[in-house]
Amino acid sequence: MSATTKKADMSRYVTKANLAGAFFENAAALDKKPLLFHKNKGKWTGRNWDEVADSVRRLAGALVAAGIKPRDRILISAENRPEWAIADLAVMSIGAIVVPAYTTNTEDDHVYIMEHSGALIAITSGGLLASRVALAASRVQHMRMLITMDPDTELPDFG
């Protein structure tokens, strides 16, 4: 690298105010074109830009209704799946901060991350991961809510 640094040519990059704004602008333009795919019972199924944008808006609205404000932190711990991207975009679209957490974390790891990040809500997939995140959240006083991506998830009873 030379002593003088050239300014990067930004003409080829998206220069929107933020990622969420760029997403919604693209969703309006690309509407019914496919965006996210996943395997369901051995078959690939997809969601188009409009469907994903609707899911992002609905989750963002639920977060706001739960009292989340800009700069609040939301933990996301889930496998690589369309709902992860939807949760990520929903959190960013309301100005909150995503706190990503590994699916391999122990309950104690999740407690540490929740306590030190100040996360108020956790979003997770289902099954054992949801149980582990729920147990961790039950140990963190400031945690308000747990949202699961899988609607039929059974969580531990905290009485």
For each predicted feature, which ranges?
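Structural core segment of the AMP-binding/adenylate-forming
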Residues: A65-A66, S93-G159
